[in-house]
A protein has these predicted regions:
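Conserved Rossmann-fold NAD(P)-dependent oxidoreductase catalytic core, especially the SDR/UDP-sugar
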Residues: 68-108
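SDR active-site strand-loop-helix element
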Residues: 7, 43-46, 81-87, 134-136
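NAD(P)H-binding glycine-rich loop region in Rossmannoid oxidoreductase-like domains
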Residues: 34-62, 73, 88-89
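Active-site helix of classical SDR
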Residues: 112-115
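C-terminal substrate-binding subdomain of Rossmann-fold SDR/epimerase-dehydratase oxidoreductases
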Residues: 162-164, 169-274
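Short acidic low-complexity segments
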Residues: 25-37, 229, 262
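N-terminal Rossmann NAD(P)H-binding glycine-rich loop of SDR-like oxidoreductase domains
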Residues: 3-22
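NAD(P)-dependent short-chain dehydrogenase/reductase
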Residues: 121-176, 181-186, 190, 217-219
């Protein structure tokens, strides 16, 4: 595979990908919008639907305006633009969704990611550019910037280690498919190697369990005394908070993908790191 220009190489998933595949990538400096390789891998993005409470413009500026500025550099070039999107574009109650299912995003982050997908498809079809869209599910791994709105699993484990009480919206009785960041990067690399162009691929593990059971397992691993407290979903979160989130990965499996780390192994690792 030809060299890959990586936009967003300092972000969590982007930096992990660059560490795993240093011989395949060329990191693009933050202020640069041009690239010279045959493929671009675009990670630049906000990460949460919570920005609406603080800054109405950040999702639009980052996920749309900056994206279009960089996409415009592909015109009249024989390149493949690989866009990292999110399973959030499907909506806030998603079970075993396939790539062709309809999308109904509800938060500023997820709406702008879906809009970026549509703009990408329109631009690429207009100017004859090849593309791939990769929709990422729930990702876990060690991240120093954990917050309740970003890498919530790591944040919860840090609370469990301190024996702090854990508040679970609606008791945590919603399904999640968590995938280690290394496996996410492995899947991305596989799609770039073998995936068809002008296609969408879900990136997830293909297995799920309730968020409550995940937290209970982590609590048992740590021997934590944390109390799990069921709390109702706040009114302002009901429309934008993603509840069930499981993605169908038949297309990814058809490329030969399988996870190297299951969630139980991953939880043991997280409990060591946080």
């Amino acid at each position: 595979m030809n060299d890959i220009s990586v936009f967003g190489s300092t972000g969590y998933i982007g930096s992990t990908f660059c560490r795993m595949y240093p011989d395949k990538i060329t990191p693009v400096p933050r202020e640069e919008k041009n690239f010279s390789t045959d493929q671009a891998l675009y990670f630049i993005s906000t990460t949460t639907n919570q920005s609406v409470f603080k800054d109405l413009h950040v999702d639009i500026d980052t996920n749309l305006s900056l994206f279009i500025d960089i996409l415009s550099k592909c015109r009249d070039r024989d390149v493949i633009f690989n866009f990292i999107s999110s399973g959030f574009v499907y909506g806030n109650d998603v079970l075993d969704y396939k790539e062709w299912y309809s999308c109904n995003p509800t938060g500023f982050y997820s709406i702008t990611k879906r809009t970026a997908e549509q703009l990408l498809i329109s631009y690429c079809k207009t100017f004859g550019i090849k593309y791939r869209i990769l929709r990422i599910g729930n990702v876990y791994g060690f991240d120093k910037t954990v917050t309740p709105g970003k890498n919530v699993l790591g944040y919860m484990i840090s609370l469990l280690k301190k024996n702090n009480p854990i508040k679970l919206f609606d008791g945590g009785n919603y399904l999640k498919d968590y995938m280690s960041v290394n496996d996410v990067c492995k899947a991305i690399d596989l799609v770039l190697e073998k995936g068809e162009v002008n296609e969408i691929y879900n990136i997830a593990s293909g297995t799920s369990q309730s968020f409550r059971s995940i937290i209970m397992t982590a609590r048992d691993i740590l021997g934590s005394q944390s109390e799990l407290i069921d709390v109702p979903m706040p009114e302002e979160q009901k429309y934008i908070q993603v509840k069930n989130m499981t993605l169908n990965i038949e297309k990814l499996k058809d490329l030969g993908f399988s996870c190297e780390m299951n969630l139980l192994e991953g939880l043991h690792k997280l409990c060591e790191l946080y």
